[in-house]
Amino acid sequence: MEVRNMVDYELLKKVVEAPGVSGYEFLGIRDVVIEEIKDYVDEVKVDKLGNVIAHKKGEGPKVMIAAHMDQIGLMVTHIEKNGFLRVAPIGGVDPKTLIAQRFKVWIDKGKFIYGVGASVPPHIQKPEDRKKAPDWDQIFIDIGAESKEEAEDMGVKIGTVITWDGRLERLGKHRFVSIAFDDRIAVYTILEVAKQLKDAKADVYFVATVQEEVGLRGARTSAFGIEPDYGFAIDVTIAADIPGTPEHKQVTHLGKGTAIKIMDRSVICHPTIVRWLEELAKKHEIPYQLEILLGGGTDAGAIHLTKAGVPTGALSVPARYIHSNTEVVDERDVDATVELMTKALENIHELKI
């Protein structure tokens, strides 16, 4: 089956490379979302927590589609007297992924300095320590400062946030590698759905949520305000189709289509919605796979518990090496996710729960 809508590379690049760790989405990604979606909806607003809520008015049930715009990162907790930065994780950061990496230290909106993730060199470690993964007390960021005063003069202070210095690149024929595909590939998806959606049988709220990586916080507050009849979350999921992973633990595979979520740690998707999405995918020949993720959650986990409860489903884009600066996705899976979400909104009046 041929890809019907190839990825817009320049838009995807803009979305994934914009800064915005949890709680600091205003540093870049929030403005990108507003600029790219405003011409395809009737109203855009930013709520008190920072969620971008784009309303495309229509007749029919009220539907919320969430994609979180925050990314994992670091926060400065201490500046050493010799200028090195001590940091803490924002979201699920594995300290092994920090060593020998380049970082952007965000001094202000649109302004950063470079840093390098470092630890004690293996050459001078004890033999037993070389076998251990570093912990947070052994990691620091080197920004080239020679003193605490110099680091402060460069603009660094307690609470300064840090992202990987990553960029979007093609990887083979159909794949991309980038920083922050979790969850900017879903942000890209809702932008594309908003553009393509011509005849929605619903009152649609596209929501770029904040602070998902630290507890599904933006989805919880935005869903409370919207009070949707149905909810959908779009996120990445694990594609562990790599050497060394048993087949029953691979979760999903790159290039085999969008993943219709059955369950993750935060939600059991409404079975009627799961079956309905499957039927739509089959009817429109959209490639799909089924997903059960035993670790990790999504905004669906917050949406479905809103007020008296919201029937909720979720679509996932398979991704390798998530929570790193080299996450990998396949454009065919992205395309399938856009297609199925669009078809769902065009046919939502047929869903009966």
From Swiss-Prot:
Does Nucleotidyltransferase show up as a keyword for this record? no
Q: Which GO terms describe its molecular function?
A: aminopeptidase activity; metal ion binding; metallopeptidase activity
What keywords are annotated for this sequence in UniProt?
A: Aminopeptidase, Cobalt, Hydrolase, Metal-binding, Metalloprotease, Protease, Zinc
- How does pH influence this protein's activity? Optimum pH is 7.5 with Leu-pNA as substrate. Strong activity is still detectable at pH 6 and 9.
Cite the InterPro entries for this sequence.
Peptidase_M42, Peptidase_M42_aminopept, Peptidase_M42_dom2
The keyword Zinc is annotated on this UniProt entry: yes
Q: Give the quaternary structure.
A: Homododecamer. The assembly of six dimers results in a tetrahedral-shaped structure; all 12 active sites are located on the inside of the tetrahedron. Substrate access is granted by four pores with a maximal diameter of 18 Angstroms, allowing only small peptides and unfolded proteins access to the active site. Beside the four entry ports, TET contains 12 small product release openings, which are large enough to allow passage of only single amino acid residues.
To which protein family does this belong?
Belongs to the peptidase M42 family.
List the protein's name: Tetrahedral aminopeptidase
This protein's species is Pyrococcus horikoshii (strain ATCC 700860 / DSM 12428 / JCM 9974 / NBRC 100139 / OT-3)
